[in-house]
């Protein structure tokens, strides 16, 4: 299947002791999307302190831009955020200046292609009638190509380490779309599960490219797929998690998989060799959502909505502050990845959703 090129050229704290991170000319920064408040909170990972809060309305965007998810260039030179309310993916530099934007309808999750200049974007969970397409954005020119992926409500997203395949999970069907970047073709994989809707929220691929994992919100499972044939993921394991498993990530060494559970307010840690639960991290979680791990694998950062309100979006439930209400601060929980212990809480602007990490080496 050929690409359909649109080419839209457009431009707190609880504290047990933790080891300090050595200073860097370009420190490791954690960017936290605060969807309901239209802001992004920037945290210095060396001190777990808020460096600044980027207000997108003050940057010329709408009153309700809804920043949802963030990815960062590995060297921290640029970061990208999906603005659900403004139908745009925005590129900013290290100084938080807007460099360019790419227009695409209700963008949701983002993923960098590690082998090219491509940035993938799916659709927001809040987009009930989202197009069955993903956006492929050239990160240098910020031009867009829309690709039909043939599954309803495409949301979950992961790109293989070699950049050859992208995996897209459907919120509306038990399906995963596989985009072959070389052949420019899309295949559909049916996820076993009968007629029960699983609601695939998050995806990730192991660092060695051999395994795909997906979270199934309604069944409370981590789905494990073998990628011996990367075009045809094969379901080989189901691992019980907490309630409403959300986004998911492998550790940099591929040894563990970490899953925030939005309704049980905890994080499941899974051994990625035996596919058994190692532990469940408890702490000051409050509707956790996004998760990211520092490049050296030492620290895990989990964004939290911190709201008791649950919105129904086309049959899918998620934590989200009630529109017009006075929202409590969002929060990021910082975890020692080796000890599986919470070490710090950092309060942010209200409604923490997705987050990204980048910059110098911690």
Question: Across the structure, where does each feature detected by a protein language model lie?
Answer:
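Extracellular interaction modules
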Residues: 1-4, 351
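Bacterial N-terminal signal peptides
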Residues: 3-12
